[in-house]
Amino acid sequence: MKKKSKIAICGFNLESNRFAPTCAESDFRENMFFVDQEISDEARKDSPAIHLGVKGFYSEMNKLFGHDDNWIDVPTMVIGSCPAGPVEEAFFNEFLEQLRLKLLAAGPLDGVYICQHGAAVATHTHDPDGIMFDLVRRVVGDETPIVATLDLHANISELMTSAVDVLVGYRTNPHVDMFDRGVEAASVLREMLDGMQPKKYTIKLPLVAPSVTQLTAKGFPYGDLIRYGQEFLDEDIFNVTILSGFAFGDTPKNGMTIIVHSRSTVENAVVVAEKLAVSAWTDRTRYLPRMTSLEKAIGLAQQAQHSAEDAPFLFADPADNPGGGGRGNTTYILEAFIAAGIKNCVFSVFYDVAAVELACKSGVNSEIEITLNSQETNEYLSLIHI
């Protein structure tokens, strides 16, 4: 009887904004914190609360092996926070120790799937992702296949690439292919279990693309580059991952990273990676942000409120994006619009616990006076009474 493959599943998901408040254990527990059998149970639900990459991995593994009884899943820890600041050292070290003990207790493993974001920063290190990858490698040994999925905003270190055999990055922003990348990770891992020994080559460019230039729709440079990369897929080149990185991580490992995987030789991966690097660098001026000044925004808003023919406008402060670790509570646009007398506009989304509590107490359709940012202070905030 053929031996069943024993596969560990783990993951640490955090996109760290260097300029945001630190991230604690409570931030992970509020968002995604699954251990042991909870991981498998959640991944097999129709609408899971766990990362969709994990669901995709389980789904494809069951298909590839015929049934979930034909492979042995070893769920350990899959945790994740909403984008936030650097993770606290004590909690991260505790996570690493728990993960290490769970992997050791699992005994000899045939493979590991890591569902990771890849842009974490800790209060004590620029590279918690690399430290975790290296820990997994040291526990399972050099011969055990390890495949990781990554957010396309991942900031890649040499430790990350050396510790893991295959790095599979998202190809969409907004991210709608997390499930698919989990499926791909399972497919690659199955090939490795059957004897495929992947070779990869990595190029990091001195190019830190602003987040507003990283959409993957047609006409955006990053999307065009990703689609160009997929044209090289064939019987030998099985994965091309292009990670734009996350500027607000503010680490030495920032920069666009191109990773090409080959089934046969690293030389084949080098050829493709260099072509993509040349294309990205040639297009570097396309990544210059084209922002709207506050003055122009006021003018557009004034124009719109006096002309029914003008389409509605949406103005946002992208540097304060909660999806990128911002707090969602800067008031620059609000203050400018109030000073300019802009009317008939909706103000949203704003993070202020005290304001929410007061609004809830006052009830629907009530009018209230509030002071925004009354309970939080930092150099980017100001109090404003409305």
Give the predicted meaning of each segment.
Residues 2-60:
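N-terminal amphipathic/basic leader segments beginning at the initiator methionine
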Residues 66, 104, 138-141, 169-172, ...:
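Generic secondary-structure signature for well-ordered alpha-helical cores
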Residues 384-386:
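Conserved small/polar residues in nucleotide/adenosyl-binding loops
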Residues 60, 194-300:
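Accessory alpha-helical/coil subdomains and C-terminal extensions
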Residues 8-15, 19, 29, 83, ...:
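Active-site histidine-anchored catalytic micro-motif
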Residues 370-382:
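Phosphate/diphosphate-binding loops
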Residues 123-128, 215-219, 302-306, 322-334, ...:
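Short glycine/threonine-rich loop-to-helix capping motif typified by GTGT followed
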Residues 58-64, 68-103:
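Low-complexity, highly charged intrinsically disordered N-terminal segments
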